[in-house]
Curated annotation (Swiss-Prot):
Localization (cell): Cell inner membrane; Cytoplasm
One Pfam family hit: SEC-C
Enzyme class label: translocase
Entry's EC annotation: 7.4.2.8
Main location: membrane
Subunit relationships: Monomer and homodimer. Part of the essential Sec protein translocation apparatus which comprises SecA, SecYEG and auxiliary proteins SecDF-YajC and YidC.
Gene that this sequence comes from: secA
Regulation: induction: Repressed under conditions of excess protein secretion capacity and derepressed when protein secretion becomes limiting. This is regulated by SecM.
Cofactor remark: May bind 1 zinc ion per subunit.
Gene Ontology biological process terms, A to Z: intracellular protein transmembrane transport; protein import; protein targeting; protein transport by the Sec complex
Family: Belongs to the SecA family.
Transmembrane segments: none
UniProt name for this protein: Protein translocase subunit SecA
């Protein structure tokens, strides 16, 4: 009560922020007449003037009013479009490291030009982040004339571009690209073998479009660069045949319930659990199939990988549905993004899940992958010095933006008042009744000339509605993952009179639905349109636009509630843009996933008490409240999952930053000999300590073991026993010094043979490759630790603290292994001529390039990260055998060619 009273008196934080910014808007408006008087050349010269002022020490905030005024005036001259005052407010919010909530149709793309220009003046680069390649290209090309008029360069960063083109794109003042591509480039840069291979500059300012989609919906999805692991496709096929024989039961076994089935499903957590009967049956079937030995248990340590196959196959059959979670196209399983309904070509689920789905669908099974590098969007975007974002729906997630990204959310007012009519939900008993009511609503509205957009949550649901509309003889267009290429065109024309468009979730997001259809699209179809033709098209569009407005504007139909209120608001937000008329309604049934899992009991009993008849709907504030509560529950659970993922990834993130920092230092120096000398001393001290304890008696020394270890690990023949016999005065300290001295002499001998420069290059290459190899193994071990760490909770230990402790120990062990491995490789390599070192260096580079070509970019499926079944780490790539053909192509056996360069 007191908080409400204080807010009434002083205004909310949002109001106070906007009030402060409106003073700057007034200042920009006062500058407008002066800007109009400037010639084009004088206006263009402002960019260099601003840059000079920044170099002299002026801060960006002081330049903001004048810089925004320059962009506004330039936009008027280049595009014929003047930034509204609310767009200036949006630009200031984005410059202020905040999230700007701007409704659909309020001109977010034009708003973004203001902070992009201002922050590009420093010359440190601005990254504009979009959700797909189409929007990145569209926005870059649309804004290119404005930025080039102002003397700024524009780059577009797309998947598949060669490194030189990417480097050029990143060197531009403003770069447009997708969140995935920026993240993958960061990972690839940290796998480069020379400074020239890197493409990104230091991460300065990121301006994220559809920020809720990228920083929240995809936050649970780490970006992973992976290479091929061991082939186990046959096992997936064999296990897949057994799963259909298992029977589902309604809930897990407990003291009060014993079912008859073999597994239960937790739909909230998206997990499958084998019952005791299920475990016995699957073990019997595995033994009958000859996959598992008689008397063995599926839970024995030797069968961890087999358990992994069974779990993956069970999840593939029970939790993942064709045309909902994935589609099968040209013999390939392609993931469908649960948030956008778009296909994710080239992305694969991890932990063997993708292979299990391929086995289920009977398509060719591709190899499992091993993680080489990974990062979450949460941690990637927190690397930027300055981060901001914009979207039409952020306020419901303001707490998450603040707690995870330290970004405040500011709701920017609309240019014109919102007059869309949002009608209460209608709830039916069955899916069939609901679909029937939707078809009837569409029929009534299209007869009056009103366009309708139908939002569904999956491809399967969109095709169900499409079939019913076809039966009813209603013309319509379907926009889902299967028709991705036509997306923008279909959306652009969805505002035509009586048009019916079915869209999965937010497919087509980023393209405005204009009432009466898009007149720009009509003009683009003409080769060289004349002024008269353009005027005719605009006049015809005006008539259509007014007719659609009179019919009530765009009507939105939601076929069910999404688990997030924000996604529902996004669907509604497609209507009522820029003060246009519009309406929306959601149709629900008790068979919808959200209602069945979260709101079924209360609403079902209410409907029964009311004596609902077939075809009747309930429309009541209580129902709306129950649904809103269900959505809040899901949002809260999803937030907890994202927060938990971040807490675990923060541990890996600290290690990642340390490794990447070390790696970049290595790349940037040409001589690592001092580091090698320091490491050699550490490694030999540790090795000798294992056999000769400091300050111990000679009788306690294991001379034979030390001699053998020096030979095996470093290829050093040292007659230590002979030295001790011949030189009684040789004590522990002098013995240590002699061993190290002899090791240095042997190394210097090799260096004299091949030359200093060649040896320096070889040292650097060995350090980089060893670091990458051990980091890859460390990531696999971390994944393995992460998947089983929750079991520590049963021992009254905090899993997060245990994970931190163990991962730190693993990291320390990895660093020690790195030192030992580097010195071992450098000591054991046998060289006779400089050409041999050059050949070895070439072989190392070819292997690195081959691996780079085989890299696959993957997304973890969210629940694969929190699966309860620990999986064995993936095996490293197969090494070249001594009797295999040499990879250099000479035709000789490896041991007789490049293999002889290594002991």
């Amino acid at each position: 009560m007191l908080v409400k009273l204080l807010t009434k008196v002083f205004g909310s934080r949002n109001d106070r922020t906007l009030r402060r910014m409106r003073k700057a808007v007034e200042l920009i408006n006062q500058m407008e007449p002066d800007m109009e008087k400037l010639s084009d050349d004088e206006l263009k010269a402002k960019t260099n003037e601003f840059r000079a002022r920044l170099e002299k020490g002026e801060v960006l905030e002081n330049l903001l009013p004048e810089a925004f005024a320059v962009v506004r005036e330039s936009s008027k001259r280049v595009f014929g479009m003047r930034h509204f005052d609310v767009q200036l407010l949006g630009g200031m919010v984005l410059n202020d490291r905040c999230i700007a909530e701007m409704r659909t149709g309020e001109g977010k793309t034009l708003t973004a030009t203001l902070p992009a220009y201002l922050n590009a003046l420093s010359g440190r680069g601005v990254h504009v982040v979009t959700v797909n390649d189409y929007l990145a290209q569209r926005d870059a090309e649309n804004n290119r004339p404005l930025f080039e008029f102002l003397g700024l360069s524009i780059g577009i960063n797309l998947p598949g571009m060669p490194a030189p083109a990417k480097r050029e794109a990143y060197a531009a003042d403003i770069t447009y690209g997708t969140n995935n591509e920026y993240g993958f480039d960061y990972l690839r840069d940290n796998m480069a073998f020379s400074p020239e291979e890197r493409v990104q500059r230091k991460l300065h300012y990121a301006l994220v479009d559809e920020v809720d989609s990228i920083l929240i919906d995809e936050a649970r999805t780490p970006l992973i660069i992976s290479g091929p692991a061991e082939d186990s496709s046959e096992m997936y096929i064999r296990v897949n045949k057994l799963i259909p024989q298992l029977i589902r039961q309604e809930k897990e076994d407990s003291d009060s319930f014993q079912g008859e089935g073999h597994f239960s499903v937790d739909e909230k957590a998206r997990q499958v659990h084998l019952t005791e009967r299920g475990l016995i049956l699957i073990e019997e079937m595995l033994m009958e199939a000859g996959i598992m030995d008689e008397g063995e248990s599926l839970y024995s340590p030797t069968n961890i990988m087999l358990m992994h196959h069974v779990t993956a196959a069970l999840r593939a059959h029970v939790l993942f549905t064709r045309d909902v979670d994935y589609i099968v196209k040209d013999g390939e399983v392609i993931i469908v993004d649960e948030h956008t309904g778009r296909t994710m070509q080239g992305r694969r689920w991890s932990d063997g899940l993708h292979q299990a789905v391929e086995a289920k669908e009977g398509v060719e099974i591709q190899n499992e992958n091993q993680t080489l590098a990974s990062i979450t969007f949460q941690n990637y975007f927190r690397l930027y010095e300055k981060l901001a974002g914009m979207t039409g729906t952020a306020d419901t997630e303001a707490f998450e933006f603040s707690s995870i990204y330290k970004l405040d959310t500011i709701v920017v007012p609309t240019n014109r008042p919102m007059i869309r009519k949002d009608m209460p939900d209608l709830v039916y008993m069955t899916e069939l009744e609901k679909i029937g009511a939707i078809i009837e609503d569409i029929r009534e509205r299209t007869v009056n000339g009103q366009p309708v957009l139908v939002g569904t949550i999956s491809i399967e649901k969109s095709e169900v509605v499409s079939r019913e509309l076809t039966k009813a003889g209603i013309e319509h267009k379907v926009l889902n993952a299967k028709f991705h290429a036509m997306e923008a065109d279909i959306v652009a024309q969805a505002g035509q009179s009586s048009a019916v468009t079915i869209a999965t979730n937010m497919a087509g997001r980023g393209t405005d639905i204009v009432l009466g259809g898009s007149w720009q699209a009509e003009i683009e179809q003409l080769e060289d349109p004349t002024e008269e033709q353009i005027a005719e098209i605009k006049a015809a569009w005006k008539i259509r636009h007014d007719a659609v407005l009179a019919a009530g504007g765009l009507h939105i139909i939601g076929t069910e509630r999404h688990e997030s209120r924000r996604i529902d608001n996004q669907l509604r937000g497609r209507s009522g843009r820029q003060g246009d008329a519009g309406s929306s309604r959601f149709y629900l049934s008790m068979e919808d996933a959200l209602m069945r899992i979260f709101a079924s009991d209360r609403v079902s009993s209410m409907m029964r008490k009311l004596g609902m008849k077939e075809g009747e709907a309930i429309e009541h504030p209580w129902v709306t409240k129950a649904i809103a509560n269900a959505q809040r529950k899901v949002e809260s659970r999803n937030f907890d999952i994202r927060k938990q993922l971040l807490e675990y990834d923060d541990v890996a993130n600290d290690q990642r930053r340390a490794i990447y920092s070390q790696r970049n230092e290595l790349l940037d120096v040409s001589d690592v000999s001092e580091t090698i000398t320091s490491i050699r001393e550490d490694v030999f001290k540790t090795t000798i300590d294992g056999y000769i304890q400091p300050e111990s008696l000679e009788e306690e020394w294991d001379i034979e073991g030390l001699t053998e270890r020096l030979k095996n690990d470093f290829d050093l023949d040292m007659p230590i026993a002979e030295w001790l016999d011949k030189e009684p005065q040789l004590h522990e300290e002098t013995l240590r010094e002699r061993i190290l001295e002899k090791a240095k002499e042997e190394y210097q001998r090799k260096e004299e043979v091949v030359g200093v420069e060649m040896m320096r290059n070889f040292e650097k290459g060995v350090m980089l490759q060893t670091l990458d190899s051990l980091w890859k193994e460390h990531l696999a071990a971390m994944d393995y630790l992460r998947q089983g760490i929750h079991l520590r909770g049963y021992a009254q230990k905090d899993p997060k603290q245990e994970y931190k402790r163990e991962s730190f120990n693993m990291f320390a062990t990895m660093l020690e292994s790195l030192k030992h491995e580097v010195i071992s490789v450098l000591s054991k390599v046998q060289v006779r001529m400089p050409e041999e070192v050059e050949a070895l260096e070439l072989q190392r580079r070819e292997e690195a390039e081959r691996l780079a070509k085989q890299q696959q970019l993957s997304h973890y499926e969210e629940n694969a990260l929190v699966t309860e079944d620990p999986n064995a780490p993936a095996t490293a790539e197969r090494k070249v055998g001594r009797n295999d053909p040499c990879p250099c192509g000479s035709g000789k056996k490896y041991k007789q060619c490049h293999g002889r360069l290594q002991s």
